[in-house]
Amino acid sequence: MKKEKRQRLIKQFVKEYEIDKQERLVELLAKKDVLVTQATVSRDIRELNLTKVPSQEGLMIYKVFSEEHLQTDIKLKKKLREVVVKIDCVDQLMVIKTLPGNAHVIGVLFDELDWKEKIGCICGNDTCLIISQSKSDREIIEERLNLII
């Protein structure tokens, strides 16, 4: 089977199922008579820019992101690593302290991502307040950020 078709199947599986392990993709592909190794699936995941995000049940599962969403995610990762000084959390609130003059950029990137767990952000010069509906939603955001930083 051609690589493009295999990768199309992988994207389809990731959209239809909560895939938390590469071995699960190997199994699903085998059911479609596509025999591949875990190493091949790993390369496909990298090429497809699949990202692991927390599911509702707390598992880290693969997700397909649009190119635009992916670019915002990459920008956020880069900026967070460059400017974040400290992150504090309480209940449904997350406070991100940044180097002076950088909080607004972090807020804009968060808004572009449009994460459903985030109600909104309020940013000043060096502080960005991320507001979630609940503590569990804030924990999902915190988990994503910990993977990034």
From Swiss-Prot:
<dbReference type="GO" id="GO:0019547">
    <property type="term" value="P:arginine catabolic process to ornithine"/>
</dbReference>
<dbReference type="InterPro" id="IPR036251">
    <property type="entry name" value="Arg_repress_C_sf"/>
</dbReference>
<dbReference type="InterPro" id="IPR001669">
    <property type="entry name" value="Arg_repress"/>
</dbReference>
<dbReference type="GO" id="GO:0051259">
    <property type="term" value="P:protein complex oligomerization"/>
</dbReference>
<dbReference type="Pfam" id="PF01316">
    <property type="entry name" value="Arg_repressor"/>
</dbReference>
<dbReference type="GO" id="GO:0034618">
    <property type="term" value="F:arginine binding"/>
</dbReference>
<dbReference type="GO" id="GO:1900079">
    <property type="term" value="P:regulation of arginine biosynthetic process"/>
</dbReference>
<dbReference type="InterPro" id="IPR036388">
    <property type="entry name" value="WH-like_DNA-bd_sf"/>
</dbReference>
<keyword id="KW-0056">Arginine metabolism</keyword>
<keyword id="KW-0804">Transcription</keyword>
<dbReference type="Pfam" id="PF02863">
    <property type="entry name" value="Arg_repressor_C"/>
</dbReference>
<comment type="pathway">
    <text>Amino-acid degradation; L-arginine degradation via ADI pathway.</text>
</comment>
<keyword id="KW-0805">Transcription regulation</keyword>
<dbReference type="GO" id="GO:0000987">
    <property type="term" value="F:cis-regulatory region sequence-specific DNA binding"/>
</dbReference>
<dbReference type="GO" id="GO:0005737">
    <property type="term" value="C:cytoplasm"/>
</dbReference>
<comment type="function">
    <text>Regulates the transcription of the arc operon, involved in arginine catabolism.</text>
</comment>
<dbReference type="GO" id="GO:0000821">
    <property type="term" value="P:regulation of arginine metabolic process"/>
</dbReference>
<keyword id="KW-0238">DNA-binding</keyword>
<dbReference type="InterPro" id="IPR036390">
    <property type="entry name" value="WH_DNA-bd_sf"/>
</dbReference>
<keyword id="KW-0963">Cytoplasm</keyword>
<dbReference type="InterPro" id="IPR020899">
    <property type="entry name" value="Arg_repress_C"/>
</dbReference>
<dbReference type="GO" id="GO:0005667">
    <property type="term" value="C:transcription regulator complex"/>
</dbReference>
<protein>
    <recommendedName>
        <fullName>Arginine regulator</fullName>
    </recommendedName>
</protein>
<comment type="similarity">
    <text>Belongs to the ArgR family.</text>
</comment>
<dbReference type="InterPro" id="IPR020900">
    <property type="entry name" value="Arg_repress_DNA-bd"/>
</dbReference>
<dbReference type="GO" id="GO:0003700">
    <property type="term" value="F:DNA-binding transcription factor activity"/>
</dbReference>
